[in-house]
């Protein structure tokens, strides 16, 4: 009977299960449950594939650092710090990220590697704190040692290579005596004076060698002579000046303390009161001109009356003609001295007029020029023809 009862219950359960499935299927609940289960299974499978194929996070710089001895030592110090204060959660994150589950040294090994002796003072803190204390003590010792060295360097005088202390001698502010430079400057002065004297003597010889008996020279010749005197004067001044000394040599040079030499000594010229200022011979010994025609102030002025000048000129012409005729100078073939002052220096042909007529023509031209230029009377003075000297009518240099 028991077997029949069990068989009846099993049939009832099957019928009930069938009835339940049919009811749930008709209501749509069974299909929804199947879909949710199916989706959950697919999601679980996909997530499993992602976890398996996921690349682990690797820090290359940290990996290279931990491969060194110092890197492992630093990681061990940090891990020992976390273990000392029981920071388990932080340590649980630190070890996976750094991949240091193995290979880190304990406290005893770290103390031995760092040379730290475990004492009462060091047990109360992590090893990282002791390392920092020792670094600070070393820095203080170095700074105190450098300060002592700096003070010794400042207070101790510098030593020579032989070991002796050398005294520091400040630079002297007294200028050096330049005696040799002054000697050179003083040695150049006689040479400059000698050159100026030679130039002045050459000017005198050149002027004295010119013919003195010819009183009818052209105005162009007179201007050429004045230009040569001006050029010679500039040469004399330049030769006397010489090279300028330096500022250092000017202070102790005795040349600038001497008085200025007189014109007689500097230019070799001395005025002769016996000769008249208006004669032709006085032009040869005249001093070098300084500026323009201002040195001709000693000549007779041009403001005399025309009648007096005309009488004087006529008398001079008569005397010159008489002397030339007595000496027989007007007959031979002679050079025209006016051409000597020209650049071509050609020989002039024999003139049909006599020398006296040429002089008269020159004088007439000069008189006309003087009369037409009254505004330049103060600046220009005529020295071409003047009254002849009573001492000698004709002068000639004797070699």
From Swiss-Prot:
UniProt-annotated location(s): Cytoplasm, Cytoskeleton, Microtubule organizing center, Centrosome; Cytoplasm, Cytoskeleton, Microtubule organizing center, Centrosome, Centriole; Cytoplasm, Cytoskeleton, Cilium basal body
UniProt GO BP: cell projection organization; microtubule anchoring
Entry keywords, A to Z: Cell projection, Cilium biogenesis/degradation, Cytoplasm, Cytoskeleton, Phosphoprotein
Domain of life: Eukaryota
Residue numbers carrying Phosphotyrosine: 337
Region (Disordered) residue spans: 143-311, 328-357
Main localization category: cytoplasm
Segments of skewed composition (Low complexity): 197-209, 286-302
Residue ranges of every copy of the LisH domain listed in the record: 70-102
Record's subunit section: Homodimer. Part of a ternary complex that contains CEP350, CEP43 and MAPRE1. Interacts directly with CEP350 and MAPRE1. Interacts with CEP19. Interacts (via N-terminus) with CEP350 (via C-terminus).
Family the entry assigns: Belongs to the CEP43 family.
Function: Required for anchoring microtubules to the centrosomes. Required for ciliation.
Full protein name: Centrosomal protein 43
Gene name linked to the record: CEP43
């Amino acid at each position: 009977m028991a077997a029949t009862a069990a068989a009846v219950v099993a049939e009832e359960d099957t019928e009930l299960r069938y009835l339940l499935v049919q009811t749930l299927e008709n209501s749509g609940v069974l299909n929804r449950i199947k879909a949710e289960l199916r989706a959950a299974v697919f999601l679980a499978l996909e997530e499993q594939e992602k976890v398996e194929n996921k690349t682990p996070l690797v820090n290359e710089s940290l990996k290279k650092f931990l491969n060194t001895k110092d890197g492992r030592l630093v990681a061990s110090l940090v891990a020992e710090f976390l273990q000392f204060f029981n920071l388990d959660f932080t340590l649980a994150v630190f070890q996976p990220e750094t991949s240091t589950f193995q290979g880190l040294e304990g406290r005893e090994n770290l103390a031995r590697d760092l040379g730290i002796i475990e004492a009462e003072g060091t047990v109360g803190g992590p090893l990282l704190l002791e390392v920092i204390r020792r670094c600070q003590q070393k820095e203080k010792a170095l700074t105190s040692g450098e300060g002592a060295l700096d003070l010794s360097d400042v207070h101790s005088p510098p030593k020579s290579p032989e070991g002796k202390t050398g005294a520091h001698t400040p630079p002297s502010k007294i200028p050096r005596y330049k005696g040799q430079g002054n000697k050179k400057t003083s040695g150049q002065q006689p040479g400059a004076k000698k050159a100026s004297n030679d130039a002045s003597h050459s000017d005198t010889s050149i002027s004295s060698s010119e013919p003195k008996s010819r009183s009818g020279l052209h105005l162009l010749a007179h201007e050429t002579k004045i230009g040569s005197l001006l050029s010679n004067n500039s040469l004399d001044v330049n030769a006397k000046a010489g090279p300028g000394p330096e500022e250092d040599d000017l202070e102790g040079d005795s040349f600038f303390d001497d008085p200025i030499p007189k014109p007689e000594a500097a230019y070799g010229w001395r005025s002769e009161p016996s000769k008249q200022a208006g004669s032709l011979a006085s032009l040869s010994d005249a001093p070098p001109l300084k500026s323009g025609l201002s040195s001709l102030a000693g000549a007779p002025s041009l403001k005399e009356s025309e009648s007096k000048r005309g009488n004087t000129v006529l008398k001079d012409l008569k005397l010159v003609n008489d002397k030339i005729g007595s000496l027989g100078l007007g007959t031979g073939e002679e050079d025209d001295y006016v051409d000597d002052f020209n650049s071509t220096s050609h020989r002039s042909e024999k003139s049909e007029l006599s020398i006296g007529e040429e002089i008269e023509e020159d004088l007439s031209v000069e008189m006309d020029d003087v009369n037409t230029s009254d505004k330049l009377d103060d600046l220009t003075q005529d020295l071409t023809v003047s009254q002849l000297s009573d001492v000698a009518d004709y002068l000639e240099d004797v070699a």
